[in-house]
């Protein structure tokens, strides 16, 4: 079984619970992120690793369009049930996005990077599909700088959640953005 298969299996089996949890978080996510992201209203947004659509649903009333991507069809179906007309759901891999260079004004990924075997490929894809002058927003777990503590944390997380791959320390995550010439705020 590949890591992607483990991710699909874990979230397919729990899609109903994930969707219920996601629905309860939409307002909180909206309240926390709108002041930070400050959408103007005319943006085309990509939400990578949307899960049951929490971020996509939170942003949808405040932007022109949201395209929400996930690897797990069961999660996309759950998101589709609550999605307004300006949200499009697409089954795709974060490391191989089916979009052209610079298609989006704002590209987001929330609580997804730690599930990826190759986070550097996903960050490169987020950067690739963001228009020049656009923004990339990533919200994920941050590991401590101590490598032994990271190993212990990841072992704990994998025992709790088999879809977990690894948590990156802040410096490593920033380094992935630096490699793609994106500034980190």
Cite the ranges covered by each PLM segment:
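Conserved small/polar residues in nucleotide/adenosyl-binding loops
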Residues: 182-184
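A conserved beta-strand element that flanks and buttresses the S-adenosyl-L-methionine
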Residues: 108
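Class I SAM-dependent methyltransferase SAM/SAH-binding core
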Residues: 46, 52-96
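Short catalytic micro-motifs in class I SAM-dependent methyltransferases
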Residues: 111-112
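A short glycine-rich, Lys/Arg-flanked "PGG" loop and its adjoining helix->strand segment in the class I
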Residues: 120-135
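Short alpha-helix
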Residues: 166-180
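Conserved class I S-adenosyl-L-methionine
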Residues: 1-40, 54-58, 75-78, 137-164
């Amino acid at each position: 079984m590949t890591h992607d298969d483990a991710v699909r299996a874990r979230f397919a089996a729990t899609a109903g619970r994930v969707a219920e949890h996601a629905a309860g978080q939409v307002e909180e996510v909206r309240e926390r992120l709108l002041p930070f992201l400050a959408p103007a209203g005319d943006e085309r947004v990509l939400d990578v690793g949307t899960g049951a659509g929490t971020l996509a649903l939170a942003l949808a009333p405040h932007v022109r369009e949201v395209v929400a991507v996930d690897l797990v069809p069961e999660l996309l179906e759950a998101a589709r049930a609550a999605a307004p007309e300006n949200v499009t759901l697409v089954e795709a891999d974060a490391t191989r996005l089916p979009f052209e260079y610079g298609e989006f004004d704002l590209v987001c990924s929330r609580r997804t990077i730690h599930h990826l075997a190759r986070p550097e490929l996903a960050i490169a894809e987020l950067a690739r599909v963001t228009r020049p002058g656009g923004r990339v927003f990533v919200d994920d777990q941050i590991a401590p700088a101590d490598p032994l503590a990271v190993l212990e944390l990841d072992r704990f997380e994998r025992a709790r959640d088999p879809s977990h791959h690894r948590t990156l320390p802040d410096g490593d995550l920033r380094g992935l953005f630096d490699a793609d010439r994106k500034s980190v705020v």
